[in-house]
């Protein structure tokens, strides 16, 4: 959890009563119908008051307000992943605060008075709280003020019981990571190495071509919000799958295009997409191979474009599936 110096605490404290009053004014207002494709959990009367009828819990009473565990916060109503613990910070406002959300997991809606912006679970429309901009509490200048009662928490040790992983390789891992991390339902995208026999390889060993590894990205995703096929399609659209052992100006075996499947279903999806692209005139060279151990790359390679503010130099999204090849 992030630690911040809250020079705006007094201003925020003064707004508590106003915020709570505005939220409580919505109590009793039920919005939207349940979707048939979502499994809704049974809620307690208090959970329903907040999540369905847009109420709020009292400040400084929620179980996650100062909670600092490592893991993922999910929607109490449908279980969809909402926030990473790395994006939580102590705003001293009485409710859990986050300065970012998992891509596509949270949607925004203006309150009736036009003054505040409500945040809801993008999967089930469950009420989460409100989002505030411009407070300068963290570098993102964003604060998601969320009711603890609207969330559940999955500890990092239990993540693989609830979410899925996929491994893609398409040139320099910086660019692949950048675009996949921004995809809906992706909880994390990690740059690393796979395909070789050397244990815990270094970047230099991979570049030497002696390790047998290639640059790859491991994606942790929420199956409630996206699918393996959607991610694989995105992968084929953010790199050129027709280039052999290279991607743009980056040349070498470590930059080859590959999908590492974890089961027969993933293999079938990957092979289907390769056939679709070949049918459109692309000569796809992407290898479809069984997944082997993935090794996380050095810290300097993680979130490279997010940290530097630069843009990928050898990856450019192209709509390959919907548009015919020119």
Map each language-model feature to its residues.
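Flexible coil/turn and secondary-structure edge motifs
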Residues: 23-326
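Bacterial N-terminal signal peptides that target proteins for export
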Residues: 2-15
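Hydrophobic helical h-region of N-terminal Sec-dependent signal peptides
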Residues: 13-24
């Amino acid at each position: 959890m992030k630690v911040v110096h809250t020079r705006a605490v007094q201003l925020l404290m003064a707004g508590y009563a106003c915020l709570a009053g505005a939220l409580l004014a919505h109590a009793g207002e039920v919005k939207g119908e349940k979707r048939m494709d979502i499994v809704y959990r049974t809620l307690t009367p208090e959970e329903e008051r907040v999540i369905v009828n847009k109420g709020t819990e009292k400040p400084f009473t929620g179980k996650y307000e100062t909670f600092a565990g490592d893991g993922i916060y999910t929607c109490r109503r449908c279980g969809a992943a909402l926030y990473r613990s790395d994006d939580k910070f102590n705003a001293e406002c009485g409710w859990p605060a986050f300065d970012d959300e998992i891509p596509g997991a949270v949607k925004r809606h203006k309150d009736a008075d036009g003054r505040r912006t409500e945040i809801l679970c993008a999967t089930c429309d469950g009420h989460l709280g409100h989002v505030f901009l411009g407070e300068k509490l963290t570098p993102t200048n964003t604060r998601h003020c969320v009711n603890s009662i609207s969330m559940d928490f999955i500890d990092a040790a239990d993540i693989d019981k609830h979410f899925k992983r996929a491994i893609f390789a398409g040139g320099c891992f910086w660019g692949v990571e950048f675009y996949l991390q921004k995809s809906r339902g992706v909880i994390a995208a990690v740059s690393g190495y796979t395909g070789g026999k050397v244990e815990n390889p270094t970047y230099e060993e991979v570049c030497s071509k002696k390790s047998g590894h290639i640059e790859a990205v491991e994606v942790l995703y929420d199956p409630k919000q996206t699918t393996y096929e959607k991610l694989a399609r995105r992968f084929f659209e953010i790199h050129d799958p027709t280039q052999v052992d290279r991607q743009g100006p980056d040349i070498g075996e470590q930059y080859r295009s590959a999908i590492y499947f974890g089961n027969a279903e993933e293999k079938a999806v990957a092979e289907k997409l390769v056939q679709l692209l070949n049918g459109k005139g692309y000569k796809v060279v992407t290898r479809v191979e069984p997944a082997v151990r993935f090794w996380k790359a050095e810290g300097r390679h993680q979130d490279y474009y997010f940290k530097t503010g630069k843009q990928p130099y050898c990856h450019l999204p192209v709509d390959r599936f919907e548009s015919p090849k020119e």
